[in-house]
Amino acid sequence: MIRFSVFLFAIGVAALAPAIASAQSTPAPAAPAASPSPSPAPNPIGPAFGANDPCTSISAIVTRPSVTNSVCTVRPNHVEIETGYQNVTFDGGGNAVTYPQALIRVGLPIPALEFDVAPPQISRASAGGVTTTGSTDVGAGLKYVFGYTPKFNYGGQVFFTAPTGTNGVSAGGTTASYALNAGYTLSPVFSLAGTATAQSQTNGTQRWSALASSLVLGVALPNATGLNAEIAQFSHAIGPGTPTRTQYLLAVYRDLGPRIQLDTSFAVSPTTATGKYHYVGFGASFYF
């Protein structure tokens, strides 16, 4: 009996030996490591300055073709160039064309501050069979965003011109503009923006103060497209003591990617005392 029991024990050990060896030599498989989530791609416009920063898209930064200035500034170490063409037809006859309507905006190292330069533009006017071509005055200024909330943003800018123009296109002296800009988001589709600008104007022999004010309704449409409808007024529009001019503008813009925007516009002034006119324009803006 003892030998038979030993024999059975030996058989049992022999049968279990492979399983025991396998358990000792093969560790349990480790749980797979979680793959890290990919980091978001950097914004091509530049990083936001805060949780409610509205200035993170080209449509928020471009300031043409409306009279109303955009509140937003170009990000530090970036440059934006705006260009355009405008063709004005006057009610009593005559025509004026201006191009390339260039504005160079440079983001400075100080956050929310930019430096602006307006090179001379070509201006061609035709009236009574006579055509005159000249260049406009050069200008420069600074623009700054004062602050923002989830719905409201505001800022200001200063701009000065020097009498560098030719062939009667120049103002004939230095001019200065001091503007306050503001914007308010009504909904994901609708927004309001406005600008109030105090101006020191001249015609070379006289100097006077004027005020330009504007209000624009913005409509965000599908496919990176938007619509702007604006009313603007200009006091002492053509000289000291002259009436206020009113202008209505309708513009459509389309973003071609995050750094290019195209626009087209139509405007009309019905003010007889300052000369009725209407114009068409188009432009392009590039962010680098």
Annotate each PLM feature.
Residues Q24-F288:
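Transmembrane beta-barrel domains of Gram-negative outer membranes and organellar outer membranes
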Residues A19-A23:
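Sec/Tat signal peptide C-region and signal peptidase I cleavage site
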Residues S5-A17:
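Bacterial N-terminal signal peptides
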